[in-house]
Amino acid sequence: MTIKSMTEYETISYKTFLDIFSPLPEIGEILEESESVEEAREKLFEFCKELEWEIRMGRIKFDNEVDRWLALKAIEVFLNIISKDNERLAGFSTLEYLWKAYKGDEEALKEIREGFIEEFRHLFLAMSGKADYSLGFLGKRLLEEGVKFIDFSKIKGREAGIARSNFLDKVYEIMREYISRYPSGLDKRIILKRKKNREILEEFFGITDEEWFNYKWQFKNVLRGLKGVKILRELREVTNFKISDEDLEIIEKAVKNGIPFGLTPYYLHLFDFENPYVEDLAVRRQVIPPEWYVEKMIEHKEDRNIAFDFMGEHDTSPIDLVTRRYVTIAIIKPYESCPQICVYCQRNWMVQDFDAKAFPGWEKVEKALDWFAEHDSMIEILITGGDPFSLSDKAIEKMLNRIAEMNHVVGVRFGTRTIVTAPMRITDELAELLGSFEKSLMISTHVESCYEITPEVAEAVKKLRTNNIYIYNQHVFHRYVSRRFENVALRIALKKVGIIPYYTFYPKGKMEHKDYLVPIARLAQEVKEEARLLPGSFRTDEPIFNVPRMGKNHLRAWQDRELIAIKPNGSRVYLMHPWEKGIYPTKLYTYEDVPIKEYLDSLKEIGENIEEYKTIWYYY
């Protein structure tokens, strides 16, 4: 998915701009008659409060109370956007663009993009009660298929129960249709396809099944550097493996410029060799970087550790290898690489090539562990990296033995993706070692799509669960795994193998990850319109936005964020409320989101019907 550059956009016509005011022409009239932005602000405030009062007094009628609720919420959003104080926080005035553009100011019209137009078109529809949000994204289709909505005021008892059950069956039929778009690695068709892929790779590398299923062979033969590029080229030449010239060139450019690239042979066999970039799109985009990412990493080659440290770990590390953002838990990073390097990694600024140099040495690790021993506030330790399961069993045991001596530590959590990228790393010996630890121990992983869930993953999870170790999933909700019901398909696959949905992360808003970002509204939409259709035990994941230096911020409601501005390109500007609010003094964080229009365009490019996402505009 390629995002347009600013120069590729066409200037919005004045007529197109004026059309957005048709649901509420009074707003346009106020802008036209106002001699200044401040005059417009005051008159718009008065208009909005009068409109709100008319709604609250019941003088404006709505077909559905949901549309009434949305109108009031949209008015609140508009008042937020025209607020003088919010302009100070955002660093610019959305109202000024509206006012100037309505006056026909050519410079303002040149800056305004379709995303801006669409935001206000939908906002004014919502304020006027004409958004038709109450029909829902499935309502139109259900009506077209002759499905009747249940009115419990008209039918009662068993008749109502049967009617409701039949209605919900129809909803599930549509839900199942969506889910079927995303094959799981547990599907027989996919299992057979990957068996053939494995056989092809075994023949190519000249190895047996025994070697393939040995994690040490997998680690030793990670495709990295120019040698890895050469292997991919040779595979394309002598087997049925397909990869585009563009991707090969981008990978080569990355490694030549010192950008770490790593791909385990196991994860490579998850690719669709013969029909690439369709069912395996998410898998490929996990490891194959887009051009924008590579260019940005090269641009900041000398200051990468500062430019891309989105979470401000330099400011939250009391000692080498330790990061602390919370009261009772901190991170230790004993290995600074992974057998497979994910493009969207938040620690791309510190991740090294997968080799011995990524281990910082026992002296540093022991000093970091001493820090935990000295701080009795640390009741849990998160061992992450990089990937700590890149280390030997002996190294892992050595760290656990040291932690076992710390009476104040209640539990340990390992953060690893080897369960997905090299599941053979979870040997009986490692599982038993972890299970023998006398304190509470759990594992968090990153499964990104149901296509990654395989029989090998299921076997790895089984070994851990047999030793009373629970595995939790932290899903990064990036652009390539954000289609309708894609995360629902993932949750179902996770539950099948015994992994518990834990967090769904908004991807870190890092400039180099532009091609992976989604609007916050899409995550909110997914939770409300898709995840909600699953049983509660399947949707145990919390939607999360990470605030730099402060950490996880829930995306539940307006107590967590405020929409305070819309930029000319259609980007929403949010004021994020950190978890510390209400506990002690803290500062709020201003974040510029990816434009919804830009995101929808990217979905359209891969064949999605963006009409299916039309309610996204109403998640503020």
From Swiss-Prot:
Family annotation (InterPro entries): Aldolase_TIM, Lys_aminomutase/Glu_NH3_mut, rSAM
Superkingdom field: Archaea
Keyword hit for Protease: no
Modified residues (N6-(pyridoxal phosphate)lysine): K552
Any one Gene Ontology molecular-function term assigned to this protein's record: metal ion binding
Cofactor(s) needed by this chain: [4Fe-4S] cluster; pyridoxal 5'-phosphate
Cofactor binding, note field: Binds 1 [4Fe-4S] cluster. The cluster is coordinated with 3 cysteines and an exchangeable S-adenosyl-L-methionine.
Residues involved in [4Fe-4S] cluster binding: C338, C342, C345
Residues in Radical SAM core domain copies: 324-586
UniProt entry tagged with the keyword 4Fe-4S: yes
Keywords of the record: 4Fe-4S, Iron, Iron-sulfur, Metal-binding, Pyridoxal phosphate, S-adenosyl-L-methionine
Family statement drawn from the similarity comment of this UniProt entry: Belongs to the radical SAM superfamily. KamA family.
Name of the featured protein: Uncharacterized KamA family protein MJ0634
Taxonomic lineage: Archaea, Methanobacteriati, Methanobacteriota, Methanomada group, Methanococci
